[in-house]
Amino acid sequence: RRTWCEDMLWWGPAGIGSTYTIARYAQQHSGPFRGAFSDRSKTNHICRLAEGHYGGFFGWPNFTARLSGEFMGMPATGKVGEFRVIDIYRRAGDKLAENWIFIDLLHFWKQQGVDVLTNITKDK
């Protein structure tokens, strides 16, 4: 609440979804995410940018974490995975109002032993 507008919008990647308001963000994304991962590394923002009311950062990988709990309906693997992330923000006044986040989930799941694209073609 110190940095976000109460009616903030968080536009998450496919498979995770989007949320409206700080409370819903905590319930639908940040809480489950924090509960599913341990041993999270520091972020590695290779690129930072800002223009007007917009800013963002990118990292390949942005951070690593161990899948120690259920995430996206998948069980814990105990494996460490890389997160490739693009994070773009919009500011309104002194607070953040919107966040668009792109996570290469195909890459993450492949590191966990799940090849999503191969599994999709097998189902046909």
Go through each PLM region and give its residues.
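C-terminal and inter-domain tail/linker signature
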Residues: 1-124
